[in-house]
Structure formats: structure tokens, C-alpha cells
């Protein structure tokens, strides 16, 4: 089936005259810096847009991210999946690199910082996209010991113990300061109010508050709203003991603890934080990390996770930590089930029954472990309602394991590009029975159906064959293949005598197919098999055009709408002509008692034609003709 891609109008690409020189200098600098970056070939290209259009899209996406942040940090509502959020942040950063003269600092509403300063900064963590990036990071760590932990899906907290007593609990905030969560922490049973007597006078722990789960399998259960639930609870003015009992704690850092990971884990386990010791493992290669990532993704855990974290065991002292991702730790998240994607083009295709389908061609994006480049937008009417255009940023989600679906348009590019879409009223069940350039999609779809096992069953004759016959001008009407001779077929490029004769044998066998099967191949509207068989027995194929809607309604299972469709179908000029020709051929076959053998590659298949007033029976299990849509 041919494609009709629609691109943003080239006239929209011209930069404003007053900014042209600066624009070109900026783009040149960005281009040179991109070429110098390792792995530059995998980076998405910079959008080809005017400065004004780019600024509009940048501000629109920045505003949407700010809205997500406000909902998450202030109301505890998670409006989008992490995959969408992360890809939106990456896209914004990419645009800022592409257009440094236009980009403005992102105004994101992070968790309210409050007045409590972290004694050691919460660093955040760099997220690596794939195994190759992980392997590169591992190689850069040299001989430093590496440890892997599950990346718990919750909210970060800093706990401060002075002389064994809990003295402070601080939300992450901006990594430097956060909200005072001390009062709420006293209601969370997982946070001990005291440490053993042998604890150092000052203990600073960083960890994740998470929603307790029983046998949570990330591959099966997903995030399950776990992080949003905890964010919502901690955003409340008060927390009850009952609510606190649903919250767990995973300590992932002891900034002022012993120098080595084994020492830290042993002490933490002795203090009651045994889960961190059980779920922290030494690794040496990207393969080791991948194995733990897969294990924790598939196996039951007491919390939701969204990947793994790997860090050096001998990291710098906490006094050197900053509120930015360090080079001694990284995260490798699970495959995203949601992501943001840019629409590059729209493709319109007309199906066999005249239904117009719309597909968006995308800038490649990873969903699950799939590289997604296309997503269905449904029918022409549905596309018009969603109004997706090239340049738009859309949110995708995996349905099941493999099928991407459009969830919403996150950013509508401005100005809106013009789209040359086909008109729905140009195509229907009886359009394109003959080839014209505007009919190519539907005509080829008709031929493909006709030759499939749903139609006349031509083994080995598929879309490529029909394309070749149409392009050569040999098939201009739906049944022109019936009159092709061997010489015409052999003249086609790449088609030898053997192939030409095989095609002709299949074409010749079509005359032995049942009348019901022929009608289905031609695209008759869906109708109860018994009704069509009865009508054929009474009127024959050529006589069906004499029936009016009331005649069809006399048959069981046929209502007013279907009766009108059948009348229109059988009164079509081409359909009537073809049915008359077929009935004439079948009458001659019946007169001569045709028996046909199909010999192909040593397989002899006997085709016995059982005639019954010009009809034969389809398999018993096929009690109704299948719908044509």
C-alpha cells in the first residue's frame, strides 16, 4: 500500500531576517559541538523550525512540565508516567542545546524547598539510556568496586540522628534544602526514632520512602501509583500512625558512614535496615548489572521500582557532595511504557472498503524494548478530532507488550502546518474498482484481498505481485488478470516462464471457486451465508442485480441498511458486468464437467467443483460472510 507523507511546509522553515546571521552562527556552533560529541549519530536532529516557532514549542513544553511538577509536588498527583516525564525533560534540554539563543532557563516547580537545609546535599542521579552507555560508564570507573541496588520508586528523604536519637527528617526539595518532615516521620514505623547505643554521635542517612507492597512484580504491576501515593501522604499537614504503617524506608546512602560499602551494609543491617544489605550486590560488568535489573524487574519485591542504581563503594566523603548528579553513580531505568515523541509526518492510506486510515511517522522513540517509529491515529474522522499535525509532541503508551497508542497531544506546534488530507466522500465500498493514480491504495488493497485466502486464494501472489502487475499496466480493472496470457507475464522484469505459468494456473483455478467465494472476493457487504446462498440459487450471480431493498429484506438476517448496501453493490455497472461474465464462464464449465488439477512442486491437489445452480459451499464453520471492514 502506498504512502502519502505530509511534511511541514518548507516556507515555514525560513528564519526571521533580523535574526538570520545570529541564528546561523548559533546553529553552526551547535552543529560543530554535536559532531564532536561521542555517540552523536544516535542523538536526534535539531528541529527545522523558525526561531519564533521553536520558542513557542519550547515555552509550551516547559509550561506542561511545570504543570506536572505542581500536581506531583503540591497535590501528590502523578499526571504522567515517568517515561513521559523523563523524555519531556530530555527533549527540553535537547532543544536548549540546539537553540542556545532562544532557550530560557526552565521554570519548573519542584517540591517546595522549605527552610531545612540538608547536612549533606542530595545529589540526584544520572540516568543512562541503554546497555552500551552502562558499559561505557563501568569502564570509566576503572578498578573502583561497584554495587547495584534496586531503584525504589518513592520519595527521597534525609534522616539525621544525633546521639542515637532522630533529630530531623527533611524532604529532598532541591537537593540543598527541603521541607521539615520530622513530625510526620515520628508516625512512620519504618523510621526508627532511636539507633543503638553504639551508633556514632552524628548519623546522616539518605533513603527512599515507599508504598509497601506484597509480592510486587514490576513487569506485571508497573508503578501502580506507588510514588504518587507517598508524595500525597507526605504533602498532607498531618500523618496518622495507620497511614505511616503503609510507608517503608529503603536507605540507599550513608554519606558520613564508613569508607567501604561492606562496612556500611553490615552496620545498617545491625541497626534494623536489613533490606538494604540484602538488596545491595557487587557487580563488575554491564552484564552483571543487566542480570540484576532483569531479576528485579521480573521477581517479587516489597516495593515498586523503576530501574537499578549502580554506585562506587568508595565514593567521595559526603562533605564533597553537591546537588547535581555525580560521576560515581548512575541509574539504568526499566523500559518506559510511556514516552514523548515528535510527529515527523502523517501518512494517509485508503483501505479496501474505502476507509481512510491515518498513521503518524515519529522521530524514533523507545517504548518497552521496542523502537517505535509509527503510531496509528485511527480513522480520518478520529484524526480530525485529535488534530495531530507534523511537529506536534505526543504522549505514547504501550498497549499490551507491543502496540503503541496515542494518549494525548502534549504540545501543539505553532503555527499549525497545513495538511493535505484525502476527502472521505471520495471513497466508499464501490470506489476504485478500476485503477487511477488517486485510487492506488484502495485498488491494490482490493487486489490483495481478492487473492488472499479470504478471497480466491492465490498462493504466492501478494502485494508485491499486484504492484508489479499494476505498475506494468497489465491490471487496470479488478478482474483484468483473468485475461492475461503467459507471454505478457513473462515479459515482466524478474518473472520467468516457471513463475508466469504458476500465476496462470492460480488465475485459471479461480473460475472453479464457488459463487459465494467470488462474491466475497469482489467485496460483497457482510451478509448471512444462508441468505446469499438462497438468493444465488434463485437468481444466479447475474440476476442479483434485479433485487431491490424489499427483496433483500425478505431474507433472514438482512435489515434495511444492509439491504440498501446489497442493492447498490449488485447494481454497480462493473460488478454487474463481471458477474455476468463469470456466470457465462461457469455455465460453460458446468456444460463440459470441468475437473481441474493443480500441480505445483510435486503436490497434486484435486479441485472438484460441486455445482448447485452455479454455487458451491464454503466450509461449514463459516456460517456468515466476514465483514469487509
From Swiss-Prot:
Name the segments for region: Disordered.
Answer: 588-629
Q: Where is the composition biased (Basic and acidic residues)?
A: 598-611
Ranges of compositional bias, category Polar residues: 588-597, 612-629
Q: Name one GO biological process term.
A: DNA replication
| Claim: Isomerase is one of the keywords in the record | no
Enzyme Commission no:
6.5.1.2
Catalytic-site annotation from UniProt: 151 (n6-amp-lysine intermediate)
Drop me one GO molecular function for this one: DNA ligase (NAD+) activity
Recorded catalytic activity of this chain's protein: NAD(+) + (deoxyribonucleotide)n-3'-hydroxyl + 5'-phospho-(deoxyribonucleotide)m = (deoxyribonucleotide)n+m + AMP + beta-nicotinamide D-nucleotide
Enzyme superclass (EC): ligase
Q: Which keywords, in A-to-Z order, does the entry hold?
A: DNA damage, DNA repair, DNA replication, Ligase, NAD
The UniProt family comment states:
Belongs to the NAD-dependent DNA ligase family. LigB subfamily.
What this chain does, per the entry, is described as: Catalyzes the formation of phosphodiester linkages between 5'-phosphoryl and 3'-hydroxyl groups in double-stranded DNA using NAD as a coenzyme and as the energy source for the reaction.
Q: Which PANTHER family match?
A: DNA LIGASE, DNA LIGASE B
Can you name this protein? Answer: DNA ligase B
The organism encoding this protein is Chromohalobacter salexigens (strain ATCC BAA-138 / DSM 3043 / CIP 106854 / NCIMB 13768 / 1H11)
Q: What gene does the UniProt entry assign to this protein?
A: ligB
